């Protein structure tokens, strides 16, 4: 189930009421008619970080490369015309020089050197910085669910 529902730019966001795996979060999001959040702009990322990070810690977002390793996409299927979340220069050593940008031409929020593929195919947002990292999908975290 969900808690802490908030609205930004015409979309509603809710946080799961418990920490869970990425797959469990995806099932709940789908059952509720939503999806794990797709972050389209720096403003949205900053807002999500401010609203959800302090009380709940690191939280799952929709970023993943489950279907194809090194090809990051969003849970709702969008790819943003840039191989999802990176600028196509990712390799087995991660994306240390990724300069992929949002629609507002501001560099995406991957933490430096991330995603680094150290056993992680699911993305989460860091509670302190709002940057993203990849980690094993079997970890337990709260999840941010987005509704159109």
Feature-to-residue mapping (PLM):
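Extracellular, disulfide-bonded carbohydrate-recognition/adhesion ectodomains
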Residues: 1-148
């Amino acid at each position: 189930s969900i808690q802490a529902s908030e609205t930004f730019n015409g979309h509603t966001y809710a946080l799961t009421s418990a920490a869970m795996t990425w797959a469990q979060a995806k099932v709940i999001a789908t059952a509720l008619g939503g999806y794990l959040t797709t972050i389209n702009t720096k403003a949205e990322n900053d807002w999500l970080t401010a609203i959800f990070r302090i009380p709940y810690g690191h939280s799952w977002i929709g970023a993943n490369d489950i279907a194809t390793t090194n090809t990051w996409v969003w849970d709702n299927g969008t790819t943003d015309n840039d191989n999802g979340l990176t600028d196509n220069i990712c390799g087995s050593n991660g994306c240390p020089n990724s300069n992929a940008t949002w629609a507002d031409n501001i560099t995406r929020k991957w933490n430096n050197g991330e995603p680094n593929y150290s056993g992680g195919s699911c993305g989460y947002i860091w509670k302190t910085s709002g940057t993203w990292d990849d980690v094993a999908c079997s970890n337990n975290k709260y999840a941010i669910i987005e509704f159109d």
